[in-house]
């Protein structure tokens, strides 16, 4: 058994019917040279890669009485008909129809008794192409691990395929712990955590002294963020929109402004939000605050889990202003350094 970290488990605890912790991506493919049996070939392609990543073969097992975080266990009875599905758009198969279908699929929570992932191959695009929608649970992995998963999944070179057909995993060498053993282990882990509390308090106190004014400045964001038309109760329905940006263009803008790609993306998002709020006559006087995920993953770390923190970044009121962007970038970098230090002390 592989116990989830507190961060991974938080995505389980925070899930509600209105806010399933699904993460997804959509890949759009050009019309295939051989359009026959596209789904069957995709299913075989996916099945041949099931042993390359632990994500595909593991499911959650809850701890008795909720005494500890859930754990990952091997699923020896994987049902590919549940995990790899087929859908089709009605004619004419526009992008709006694709977005509407993906929104409906993304609103459906994943079954926690099965491995937490699904692929949908969606046919019927108006140009003859097809799309693949990949859905997984945030407790599985973060964005960096997600990209590594897609790199392995969408590598269609002949030398990337496994040398042998997929195997059904052998039963675990040790049987799954029974209720008494799991409970005993969970209680022991809980007591170890209690004994570690004095050290945690010392670490927190030291971190607070080191962070000083930066901590007060960043935490003040939480109290100065204005309320907008987005601050409403979330329903079970989802909307899905898309936009395309040229990565070379984004890199060129970042280089010209001596900022990062993340800075450019934040400026684009801030500009879009500003335009939307102006059009709806609800632009607040104070700037908005964005919670931006940032990776804490060390180079070469390929584990399938979450290693990230959230940076609180104040969005410029005039994000397209060159002066505003140049002034905001050093301030944001300073606040990011503060939060990175907080994360290194176990606060992230």
Model-derived segments and spans:
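Soluble acyl-CoA-dependent acyltransferase catalytic core bearing the H(X)4D motif
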Residues: 1-7, 26-348
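Generic start-of-chain signal for non-secretory N-termini
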Residues: 1-22
């Amino acid at each position: 058994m592989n116990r989830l970290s507190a961060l991974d488990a938080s995505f389980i605890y925070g899930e509600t019917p209105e806010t399933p912790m699904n993460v997804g991506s959509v890949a759009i493919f050009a019309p295939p040279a051989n359009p026959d049996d596209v789904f069957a070939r995709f299913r075989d392609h996916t099945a041949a890669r099931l042993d390359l990543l632990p994500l595909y073969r593991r499911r959650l097992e809850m701890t008795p009485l909720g005494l500890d975080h859930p754990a990952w266990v091997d699923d020896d009875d994987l049902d590919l008909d549940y995990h790899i599905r087929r859908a089709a758009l009605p004619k004419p198969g526009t992008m709006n129809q694709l977005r509407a279908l993906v929104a409906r699929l993304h609103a459906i929570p994943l079954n926690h008794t099965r491995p937490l992932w699904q692929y949908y191959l969606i046919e019927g695009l108006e140009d003859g192409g097809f799309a693949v929608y990949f859905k997984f649970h945030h407790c599985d992995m973060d964005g960096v691990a997600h990209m590594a998963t897609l790199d392995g999944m969408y590598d269609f070179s002949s030398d990337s395929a496994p040398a042998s057909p997929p195997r059904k995993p052998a039963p675990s060498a040790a049987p799954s712990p029974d209720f008494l053993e799991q409970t005993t282990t969970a209680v022991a882990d809980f007591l170890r955590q209690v004994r570690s509390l004095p050290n945690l308090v010392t670490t927190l106190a030291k971190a607070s002294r080191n962070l000083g004014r930066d901590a007060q400045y960043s935490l003040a964001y939480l109290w100065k963020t204005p309320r907008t038309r987005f601050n409403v109760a979330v329903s079970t329905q989802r909307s899905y929109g898309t936009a395309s940006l040229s990565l070379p263009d984004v890199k060129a803008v970042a280089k010209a402004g001596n900022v990062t790609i993340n800075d450019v993306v934040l400026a684009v998002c801030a500009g879009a939000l500003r335009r939307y709020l102006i059009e709806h006559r609800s632009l607040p006087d104070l700037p908005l605050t964005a919670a931006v995920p940032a990776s804490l993953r060390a180079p070469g770390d390929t584990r399938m889990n979450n290693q990230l923190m959230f940076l609180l970044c104040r969005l410029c009121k005039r994000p397209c202003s060159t002066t505003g962007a140049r002034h905001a970038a050093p301030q944001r970098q300073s606040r990011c350094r503060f939060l990175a230090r907080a994360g290194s002390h176990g606060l992230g």
